[in-house]
Amino acid sequence: MTARYIAIDWGSTNLRAWLYQGDHCLESRQSEAGVTRLNGKSPAAVLAEVTTDWREEKTPVVMAGMVGSNVGWKVAPYLSVPACFSSIGEQLTSVGDNIWIIPGLCVSHDDNHNVMRGEETQLIGARALAPSSLYVMPGTHCKWVQADSQQINDFRTVMTGELHHLLLNHSLIGAGLPPQENSADAFTAGLERGLNTPAILPQLFEVRASHVLGTLPREQVSEFLSGLLIGAEVASMRDYVAHQHAITLVAGTSLTARYQQAFQAMGCDVTAVAGDTAFQAGIRSIAHAVAN
């Protein structure tokens, strides 16, 4: 019989769990008990609750995300890059009887200090679904990952998503704004500005001035700012993009469309893989190996 196993995506604020029989998902569950929201419960107790009626004797559990951080269940040490894709699933951290945490990745050079935790699992899945020499993984912190067919060679992080949130919600740029609305035109205008002038520090206050003076509709500030930041990010990473034969974009639907537009404006073709699809493919491959 094909082995059963449980895959867990356990982040700071949420937990998602899947019960698999081979490659077939039997059931999935979600919880708001992220590692920073355990409400006094132990991680083991939360896991037992979420997987009630799932765990037969010795059913393996493989987890990824912030559960392996210093605020999680137990620190799963980072693997230093360069690192083979295969080594990620070979260096799991045990936290119980057949319960495992996937390690994160780190870079520590004079000119680059970086970490990732959770995205490494997406990378494994993305590599299987759309092999590439450059993986771009937008989100709160966008990861730019250089790889070949066997190993991850380097990565950088750009805090575009978090910066957008901070500027819109905790700076003068967003002070007193009405509810924001979608606007493809405002996003495109910001994108063009960011691509053409990636040094955005002098431009940020202009976003505020533009809506104060009425040249930018106040309801469209978020869209313009999003375009400005994404354009500046992609333009500033031109050297990372140069000479790449294939680019894989790993993200949800909304961010995929925004980054695709940015890459197309630079004349780059990309292949898109849904972030959730990549994560499940990656953690399934590791958990399946553990179970068998």
Curated annotation (Swiss-Prot):
Q: What are the inducing conditions?
A: Part of the dgoRKADT operon, which encodes proteins for the metabolism of D-galactonate. Negatively regulated by DgoR. Expression is induced in the presence of D-galactonate.
Alphabetized GO MF terms: 2-dehydro-3-deoxygalactonokinase activity; ATP binding
The first-level EC class reads transferase
Report which superkingdom the organism of origin falls in.
Bacteria
Instruction: Give the Enzyme Commission number.
Output: 2.7.1.58
Q: Which UniProt keywords apply?
A: ATP-binding, Kinase, Nucleotide-binding, Transferase
Could you tell me which pathway this protein works in?
A: Carbohydrate acid metabolism; D-galactonate degradation; D-glyceraldehyde 3-phosphate and pyruvate from D-galactonate: step 2/3
Reported phenotype of the disruption mutant: Deletion mutant cannot grow on D-galactonate.
Q: Which InterPro entries match?
A: DGOK, DGOK_C, DGOK_N
One biological-process term from Gene Ontology?
Answer: D-galactonate catabolic process
* A Pfam family: DGOK
Q: Which reaction does it catalyse?
A: 2-dehydro-3-deoxy-D-galactonate + ATP = 2-dehydro-3-deoxy-6-phospho-D-galactonate + ADP + H(+)
State the family named in the UniProt similarity comment for this chain.
Belongs to the DgoK family.
Protein name per Swiss-Prot or TrEMBL: 2-dehydro-3-deoxygalactonokinase
Gene that codes for this?
dgoK
